[in-house]
């Protein structure tokens, strides 16, 4: 073989190798670099989460005004400074809005290929507001007190607050995906709890649709996150339904599709004699540890312990994912769950202070909140 031919083959091979290396390098840069800045920022935010010691100090506030003052230098300070009064409702709204601020930030700083997920997550506040307004209208409570001023259709929600009848609310929601659940409620095809469940089911379906449009690591992480949330909702629904004696056939219809638990397991839970037997059906799923840690509580009729254990499981899984995929959307999801848990503890402290519970007892209770 002539030297020129060998040289040509070598040149062609080198070009192919360099092209492959360039392609792989470009793929890695496209895949991971967009997460460098947002995840560094989120790690800094994690460092500002309240320590257990800080929570114990807040438990000693004695007055709600002191509680607010003690959080002035935290990430909640901005929203708390806008309070109209030091009432439980106003403080809880400020804490909720602080959480919304977090999602809005992620929507802004995360890579474009996952921003849409946080946009859909924000729509949960539309669902919450609609459900809260409808509940208030039906029970005769002031609807405005239950509205969080945020959401894609906030103007419609405000119009709902002013509506005199459920029929007016239906007209306001005409053309949205929320029109049909309200129509079914008005026609008495579903009751209020079923209406609420249907509304949240629509939201989770939108999250699933978005997840299924992704690929690679993003799809893997987001899929586990959303399917775990759906599992949590379905498990809670079944256990509470078993405790209150809801019809099995009606319960099957209310299940949210898209979770990781198989239909056979869910139906076995529905067919179980009582909540404990239903919980036992989860022993061969990834929730075996949840079963182990909450069996005794369920025997005593306490379903909330299962819900706490499920939240803890999801939070731990996202933390593990954020460590395994340090340059991924898992970091944002893990932080979001930590923040949500922190707000849950803060709300518990607020209510207990308002109820004049002793600081020592508040510390005990908050330690149990998850």
Curated annotation (Swiss-Prot):
<comment type="similarity">
    <text>Belongs to the V-ATPase V0D/AC39 subunit family.</text>
</comment>
<dbReference type="Pfam" id="PF01992">
    <property type="entry name" value="vATP-synt_AC39"/>
</dbReference>
<comment type="subunit">
    <text>Has multiple subunits with at least A(3), B(3), C, D, E, F, H, I and proteolipid K(x).</text>
</comment>
<dbReference type="GO" id="GO:0005886">
    <property type="term" value="C:plasma membrane"/>
</dbReference>
<keyword id="KW-0406">Ion transport</keyword>
<keyword id="KW-0472">Membrane</keyword>
<keyword id="KW-1003">Cell membrane</keyword>
<keyword id="KW-0813">Transport</keyword>
<dbReference type="GO" id="GO:0005524">
    <property type="term" value="F:ATP binding"/>
</dbReference>
<dbReference type="GO" id="GO:0042777">
    <property type="term" value="P:proton motive force-driven plasma membrane ATP synthesis"/>
</dbReference>
<dbReference type="InterPro" id="IPR035067">
    <property type="entry name" value="V-type_ATPase_csu/dsu"/>
</dbReference>
<dbReference type="GO" id="GO:0046961">
    <property type="term" value="F:proton-transporting ATPase activity, rotational mechanism"/>
</dbReference>
<protein>
    <recommendedName>
        <fullName>A-type ATP synthase subunit C</fullName>
    </recommendedName>
</protein>
<dbReference type="GO" id="GO:0033179">
    <property type="term" value="C:proton-transporting V-type ATPase, V0 domain"/>
</dbReference>
<keyword id="KW-0066">ATP synthesis</keyword>
<dbReference type="InterPro" id="IPR002843">
    <property type="entry name" value="ATPase_V0-cplx_csu/dsu"/>
</dbReference>
<keyword id="KW-0375">Hydrogen ion transport</keyword>
<dbReference type="GO" id="GO:0046933">
    <property type="term" value="F:proton-transporting ATP synthase activity, rotational mechanism"/>
</dbReference>
<dbReference type="InterPro" id="IPR014272">
    <property type="entry name" value="ATPase_V0-cplx_csu"/>
</dbReference>
<dbReference type="InterPro" id="IPR036079">
    <property type="entry name" value="ATPase_csu/dsu_sf"/>
</dbReference>
<dbReference type="InterPro" id="IPR044911">
    <property type="entry name" value="V-type_ATPase_csu/dsu_dom_3"/>
</dbReference>
<dbReference type="InterPro" id="IPR050873">
    <property type="entry name" value="V-ATPase_V0D/AC39_subunit"/>
</dbReference>
<comment type="function">
    <text>Component of the A-type ATP synthase that produces ATP from ADP in the presence of a proton gradient across the membrane.</text>
</comment>
């Amino acid at each position: 073989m002539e030297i020129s031919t060998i040289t040509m083959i070598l040149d062609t091979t080198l070009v192919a190798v360099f092209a492959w290396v360039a392609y792989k390098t470009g793929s890695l840069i496209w895949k991971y670099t967009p997460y460098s800045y947002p995840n560094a920022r989120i790690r800094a935010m994690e460092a500002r989460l309240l320590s257990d010691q800080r929570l114990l100090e807040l438990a000693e506030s004695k007055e709600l005004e002191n509680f607010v003052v003690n959080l002035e230098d935290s990430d909640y300070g901005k929203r708390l400074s806008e309070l109209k009064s030091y009432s439980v409702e106003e403080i809880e709204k400020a804490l909720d809005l602080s959480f919304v601020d977090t999602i809005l930030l992620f929507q802004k700083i995360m890579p474009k290929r996952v921003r849409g997920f946080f946009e859909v997550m924000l729509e949960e506040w539309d669902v919450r507001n609609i459900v809260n307004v409808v509940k208030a209208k039906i029970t005769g409570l002031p609807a405005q007190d239950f509205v969080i001023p945020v959401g894609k259709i906030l103007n419609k929600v405000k119009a709902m607050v002013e509506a005199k009848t459920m029929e007016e609310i239906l007209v306001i929601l005409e053309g949205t995906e929320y029109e049909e659940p309200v129509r079914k409620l008005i026609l008495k095809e579903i009751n209020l709890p079923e209406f609420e469940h249907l509304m949240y089911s629509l939201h989770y379906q939108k999250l699933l649709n978005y997840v299924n449009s992704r690929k690679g690591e993003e799809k893997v992480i987001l899929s586990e996150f959303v399917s775990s949330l759906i599992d949590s909702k379905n498990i809670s629904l079944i256990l509470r339904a078993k405790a209150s004696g809801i019809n099995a056939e009606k319960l099957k219809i209310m299940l949210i599709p898209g979770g990781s638990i198989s239909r056979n397991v869910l139906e076995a839970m529905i067919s179980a004699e009582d909540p404990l037997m239903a919980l036992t059906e989860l022993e061969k799923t990834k929730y075996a540890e949840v079963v182990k840690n909450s069996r005794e509580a369920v025997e005593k009729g306490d379903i909330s312990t299962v819900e706490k254990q499920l939240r803890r499981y999801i939070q731990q899984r996202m933390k593990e994912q954020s460590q395994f995929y340090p340059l991924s959307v898992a970091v944002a999801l893990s932080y979001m769950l930590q923040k949500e848990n922190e707000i849950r503890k803060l709300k518990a402290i607020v209510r207990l202070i308002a109820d004049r519970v002793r600081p020592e007892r508040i510390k005990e209770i908050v330690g149990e909140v998850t």
